């Protein structure tokens, strides 16, 4: 199902022991944890692009403590996936949403992210899914109409590529931070709902919209994890227990 990520190639990849190879002999490593690295050298804007290991660990602790559980349940309800679905999480991070939903539903799951550290964590925790390191801002390494569902959860969006890999009538779930998300830590945010809907006007129809919010009492260590996960500078004197709002805008589209 994977395609070669070398520019101008895009031929199907086949497994050859610990690597993936295309008919033109372009080769890609399979890590010990099981993920496939398709990231091209010219696509690296930094030595280790994407989320840092520290941010990934902080986000994982927040997930494990249940602060984002209502978001996960709302996403599951919105996409209504079954075991027959083929699901792509573009910008999957540590794999929390895709991995837990796959465990519950048994669908064919594929996650892609530019951060090798994030994808490695996902592969170790959720080995039933296929995990790929690649730049989702570029051409996605999948054939046309490969997926029945695509997820884009607080990540970068690539509307034309989402449409290309999504089957006709397939579902796209886009989650963006609501204006009151983490308002106690970073102030009120911009409402990007209308702008996001406009980006998907070509090739998609908006079929549902829902805001999912909850407030939680965080101890100082959890507040620190939130700050690290959103790359805010840490000041020891300001890291104290606080009641914090977690809020997402869920936009469900159908491929036209």
Question: Can you describe what each PLM-predicted range is?
Answer:
Residues 65-83:
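Conserved alpha-helix/loop element of class I SAM-dependent methyltransferases that forms part
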Residues 212-256:
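Conserved Class I S-adenosyl-L-methionine
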Residues 45, 50-71:
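Class I SAM-dependent methyltransferase Rossmann-like catalytic core
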Residues 86-88, 93-139:
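Class I SAM-dependent methyltransferase SAM/SAH-binding core
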Residues 159-171:
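A short glycine-rich, Lys/Arg-flanked "PGG" loop and its adjoining helix->strand segment in the class I
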Residues 138-149:
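A short acidic, Gly/Pro-enriched loop at the edge of an enzyme's catalytic core
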Residues 170-180:
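Conserved beta-strand signature within the Rossmann-like core of class I S-adenosyl-L-methionine
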Residues 1-48:
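N-terminal auxiliary segments of SAM/dcSAM-dependent transferases
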């Amino acid at each position: 199902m994977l395609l070669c990520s070398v520019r101008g190639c895009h031929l199907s990849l086949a497994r050859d022991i610990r690597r993936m190879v295309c008919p033109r002999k372009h080769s890609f490593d399979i890590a010990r944890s099981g993920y496939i690295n398709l990231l091209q050298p010219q696509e690296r804007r930094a030595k280790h692009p994407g989320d840092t290991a520290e941010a990934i660990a902080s986000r994982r602790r927040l997930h494990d403590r249940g602060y984002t559980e209502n978001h996960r349940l709302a996403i599951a309800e919105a996409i209504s996936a079954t075991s027959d679905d083929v699901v792509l999480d573009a910008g999957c991070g540590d794999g929390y949403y895709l991995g837990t939903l796959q465990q519950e539903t048994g669908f064919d799951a594929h996650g892609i992210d530019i951060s090798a550290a994030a994808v490695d964590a996902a592969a170790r925790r959720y080995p039933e899914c296929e995990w790929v390191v690649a730049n989702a801002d570029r051409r996605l390494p999948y054939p046309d109409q490969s997926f029945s569902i695509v997820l884009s959860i607080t990540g970068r969006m690539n509307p034309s590529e989402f449409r290309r890999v999504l089957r006709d009538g397939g579902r796209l779930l886009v989650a963006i931070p609501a204006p009151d998300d983490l308002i106690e830590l970073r102030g009120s945010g911009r409402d990007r709902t209308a702008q996001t809907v406009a980006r998907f006007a070509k090739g998609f129809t908006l079929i549902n919209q829902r805001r999912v919010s909850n407030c939680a009492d965080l101890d100082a260590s959890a507040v620190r994890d939130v700050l690290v996960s959103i790359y805010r500078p840490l000041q020891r004197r300001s890291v104290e227990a606080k009641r914090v709002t977690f809020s997402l805008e869920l936009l469900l589209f159908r491929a036209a």
